[in-house]
């Protein structure tokens, strides 16, 4: 099979011919139809997420069709369209798994990091972390739902319930793949969107307006109204104190990325009055089931830039440079 292989952090991915993997017990072999390019891929590629499996096939926003079932797999059929997200394995026995918080498992394995992912024509996945894809989406359109959508959805849940009797104002810092999905779900919940982008990023600001943002500005600006909550998708630690200054008393700031530059020190007064800063880690299977059922009801519409598998290096660089509106998706 064709694959784009990472041999060392920071070096261009290499086009390679690899054997088609065989599913072990409780695994599913999937013929990949599309794989989204996520900022987490860039963190792995750059070595910011250390100790990946090497050589490695990146990619964890995988959509494809079941080619074969390993032993002891139930509830799936050959030919069914399915998706594979970032969290690819949990031990099921640690304190967190037993407490229903498998996203914090002590011994997890992640797709496209410790398990070969979807920058290839085929992949295998643990059947527990394979999910049916809803109708109404092409393969490419569905791919960003598997991480940008799922992590965005979990981030939104962690901002808390929408206040009753007053407009709920949600700030989103960094308006890329995850933000464009979260904005649609938040508006479905009658939240008002305040979008923060890089200074001068007219393309991202116009994209936010198209998705219904009531205010758009640069990340170093204060919004005209105090926010009830903020989600930070940009991997920039200095945005944490900026967001704390923007939220009202008891406001919640959620850091929605897996990696962030160092957070600078800040005065206690901007955290005081019961403001909260929290991070998001991975996803649960319940998150996936809830969001994939909700997405077509909103309906969430993804904006994608399809690219051939051989253009994986170009896709990563365009993501790095902020040149994408929506999400790049590789087509094997």
Locate each region found by the language model.
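Glycine-rich beta-strand-centered segment in the early N-terminal region that forms part
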Residues: 19-35, 48-95, 129, 134-136
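Cytochrome P450 core scaffold surrounding the K-helix E-X-X-R motif
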Residues: 40-43
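Structural detector of well-ordered beta-strand residues that form the stable sheet scaffold
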Residues: 63, 83, 131, 171, ...
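Mid-domain Rossmann-like dinucleotide-binding core that forms the NAD(H)/NADP(H) cofactor-binding site
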Residues: 82, 135-220
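NAD(P)H dinucleotide-binding glycine-rich loop of Rossmann-like/cofactor-binding domains
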Residues: 90-173
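Glycine-rich cofactor phosphate-binding loops and adjacent beta1-alpha1 units
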Residues: 161-170, 194, 202-276
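C-terminal hydrophobic helical "lid"/dimerization subdomain
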Residues: 241, 285-332
């Amino acid at each position: 099979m064709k694959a784009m292989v990472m041999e060392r952090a920071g070096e261009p991915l290499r086009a390679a011919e690899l054997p088609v993997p065989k599913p072990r017990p409780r695994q599913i072999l999937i013929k990949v139809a599309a794989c989204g390019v996520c900022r987490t891929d860039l963190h792995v590629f750059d070595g910011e997420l250390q100790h990946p499996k090497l050589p490695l096939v990146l990619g964890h926003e995988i959509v494809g069709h079941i080619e074969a079932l390993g032993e002891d797999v139930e509830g799936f059929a050959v030919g069914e369209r399915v998706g594979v997200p970032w969290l690819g394995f949990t031990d099921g026995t640690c304190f967190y798994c037993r407490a229903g918080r498998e996203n914090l498992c002590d011994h997890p394995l992640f797709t496209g990091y410790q398990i070969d992912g979807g920058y290839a024509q085929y992949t295998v996945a643990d059947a527990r972390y394979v999910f049916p894809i809803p109708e109404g989406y092409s393969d490419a359109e569905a791919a960003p739902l598997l991480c940008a959508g799922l992590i965005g959805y979990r981030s939104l849940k962690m901002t808390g319930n929408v206040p009753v009797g007053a407009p709920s104002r949600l700030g989103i810092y960094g308006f890329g793949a995850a933000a464009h999905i979260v904005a649609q779900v938040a508006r479905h919940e009658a939240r008002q969107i305040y979008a923060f982008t890089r200074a001068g990023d007219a393309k991202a600001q116009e994209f936010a307006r198209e998705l219904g943002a009531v205010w758009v500005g640069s990340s170093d600006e204060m919004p005209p109204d105090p926010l009830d909550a903020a989600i930070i998708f940009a991997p920039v630690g200095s945005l944490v104190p900026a967001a704390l200054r923007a939220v009202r008393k008891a406001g919640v700031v959620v850091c929605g990325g897996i990696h962030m530059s160092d957070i600078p020190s800040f005065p206690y007064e901007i955290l005081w009055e019961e403001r909260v800063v929290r991070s998001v880690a991975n996803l649960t299977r319940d998150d996936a089931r809830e969001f994939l059922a909700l997405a077509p009801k909103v309906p969430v519409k993804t904006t994608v830039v399809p690219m051939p598998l051989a253009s994986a290096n170009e896709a990563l660089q365009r993501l790095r440079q902020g040149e994408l509106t929506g999400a790049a998706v590789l087509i094997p």
